[in-house]
């Protein structure tokens, strides 16, 4: 499983987004491109071009660039702006070239049907990771289609950055997550739309780069004591990335953390006996189940459904994750129709839309015809029916 704090990240852009959300004037309903010249932090000027997503009352803008990155431009820093018709997306190779230019020397590009894998690992490792990601991509779409929520096809390649070693990974990750880079082993960043991680097992550095077979690389990796953590991290973060790129969630929309993390933990469960280390969606996530059984907390269900704060508290985050997994597991197994209706509601939330505890409670009640507190006892009874650890 992922490291204890693998997904507990207080993103540095969270406060900025909250500030912008308070004063949103309009969300773009039709694709519109914009070119903005704004004052740069160093006193010069910066040019930003891309798709306009949100405009705030004070003139601040949320723009998505051609490399899929979101940029917030303060209204009082904007010098000029020009509207234009939507540009064609970058070709995969050009997107890859521009992404590689941002990474340290030695990174290479592996292109698959849906992914751009930027890596300084062996080719075999990259191919193993790519095969796992493509398997997840297919399974993700199939699962939600069967749930009654057909998703949008990915319009653009999804970018994944894989470092071979932890030291280089931490140096790069520090720019996104600060000091948390030392305690997490991978993350999906909504602002860059990228997954960043590294070879948790440490085995790839010992591989001969001429070993280009995904099967050979996977066999070595999955025999590692840390294989479960490697697979769970990659699947967990890739699930987030898929959710925010297929219409299940919109980037920077107020999707409750319990939903996004609950879905990711629902998908992440490794199966190390398989060639890729993962196969089944919705298997019992044993570490999460064991934790929620030991530390089920009355009232926490209501708090995670109406607020994200438990996930930001280091003393409570792990238990909150376990409760999120258990709740999603219960709803997905026993209340599928209402669960699909609830996810449909959340998919319609726009970037930086209004959010509050009351709105979250109303949304939950509208879908499930009960309050979060009413779910505790049915959830506990269901968890008691699941088999104990072997």
Locations of regions flagged by a protein language model:
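N-terminal secretory signal peptides that target proteins for export/translocation
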Residues: 1-10
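Bacterial N-terminal signal peptides
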Residues: 12-23
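Compositionally biased alpha-helical segments
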Residues: 27-147, 172-173
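Short, surface-exposed beta-edge/turn micro-motifs
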Residues: 31-34, 157, 325
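Solvent-exposed coil/turn segments that connect beta secondary-structure elements
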Residues: 66-68, 76-78, 83, 122-123, ...
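Short intrinsically disordered coil segments
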Residues: 90, 175-179, 281
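Juxtacatalytic substrate-recognition/specificity segment
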Residues: 104-251, 256, 351, 359-366
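Acidic/His/Gly-enriched intrinsically disordered linker/tail segments
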Residues: 183, 187-197, 229, 233, ...
